[in-house]
From Swiss-Prot:
Binding sites annotated in the UniProt record for [4Fe-4S] cluster: 120, 123, 211
Protein name: tRNA-cytidine(32) 2-sulfurtransferase
Record-linked InterPro entries: Rossmann-like_a/b/a_fold (IPR014729), TilS/TtcA_N (IPR011063), tRNA_Cyd_32_2_STrfase (IPR012089), tRNA_thiolation_TtcA_Ctu1 (IPR035107)
NADP among keywords: no
Signal peptide: none
Family annotation (PANTHER family): AMINOTRAN_5 DOMAIN-CONTAINING PROTEIN, SULFURTRANSFERASE-RELATED
Subunit composition and interactions: Homodimer.
Pathway as given in its UniProt record: tRNA modification
Length: 310
């Protein structure tokens, strides 16, 4: 690598590193992900996202005003051809405590899922159960997963399109049994930034080949849709994620999230003006200085010229 290219490489890495650290720091602060004395079990798959998460958390650990412990954990699911030496060598080079777990979930998945069908759901459930149990065993107070902003948005659309639910991946989650807290420090990070960061840092990526033809998965189709939107309408993905953080249950249709049944009007509420607001055409009385709300003083000045009552 020439000196000029090396300088560009370093400058780009530094810029990207600062952005990712800032985004991770913001997510941690916004959701109170890490507290003083925490023991963080950082789950590594060997993919770009989990490598980046560990790298950034280790850097923040050195700078944070609080003390917390990081333990890296990888689950070897006994996939054929899995390079068992890669992660131990990398983690020992970093001098980070780690555990490599072994559980043959590969055989279970292949036995239970017909050929050609998506294995991700069962695979993730088996993996989650193993990691949850091990976290309790070592006394981990938080389990850190490497899901990023794109994963969260994709999951929302997957659940909308194929599950009929407005449900995504929360940045912080309490397990159903209450025994584990899951955190996603990369919740504010873009996948393309993490991919570039992994390339610049030259992480020893281990590809997942268990699922076979990944491009046939529903998630890949949703990802393509979102990528197309991002190209055609820059800023749309950011707006979607912002909207996910600004929900209004009273403006939706989910009866579990808001008690519509008990909604009643207050007959004693004071009336503002001679004419009820609901009877006024909003566009006639918009007060620009009042955030687009109806100018009730103007409404009050209307003369009622005709009334018919039965």
């Amino acid at each position: 690598m020439s000196e000029e290219l090396s300088k560009k490489h370093t400058n780009r890495l530094n810029k990207l590193q600062k952005r990712l650290r800032r985004e991770v720091g913001s997510a941690i602060a916004d959701y109170n992900m890490i507290e003083d004395g925490d023991k963080i079990m950082c789950c590594l798959s060997g993919g770009k996202d989990s490598y980046a998460m560990l790298d950034i958390l280790m850097n923040l650990q050195q700078r944070a005003p609080i003390q917390f412990e990081i333990i890296a954990v990888n689950l070897d699911q006994k996939q054929p051809g899995f390079p068992e030496h890669v992660l131990p060598a990398y983690l020992e080079k970093l001098n980070v405590p780690y555990h490599i777990l072994e559980k043959d979930t590969y055989s279970i998945v292949k036995d239970k899922i017909p050929e050609g069908k998506t294995t991700c759901s069962l695979c993730s459930r088996l993996r989650r159960g193993t990691l949850y149990g091990f976290a309790q065993r070592i006394g981990a107070t938080k389990i850190a997963l490497g899901h990023h902003r794109d994963d969260i948005i994709e999951t929302l659309f997957l659940n909308m399109f194929f599950g009929g639910k407005m449900k995504a991946m929360p940045p912080k989650l309490l397990s159903d049994d209450g025994a584990n807290v899951v955190i996603r420090p990369l919740a504010y990070c873009r996948e393309k930034d993490l991919e570039e960061y992994a390339n610049l840092k030259e992480f020893p990526i281990i590809p997942c080949n268990l699922c076979g033809s990944q491009e046939n998965l529903k998630r890949a189709a949703v990802k393509d849709m979102l990528n197309q939107w991002d190209r055609q309408y820059p800023g749309r993905i950011e707006t979607i994620f912002t909207a996910m953080q600004n929900t209004a249950p009273s403006q939706g249709v989910d009866r579990e999230q808001f008690d519509f049944v008990s909604l009643t009007r207050d007959p004693d509420a004071p009336m503002r003006g001679d004419v009820a607001e609901a009877n006024l055409p909003a566009f006639d009385f918009l007060d620009i200085a009042n955030s687009g709300r109806i100018d009730l003083d103007a409404a009050k000045r209307i003369d009622i010229v005709n009334t018919y009552e039965v």
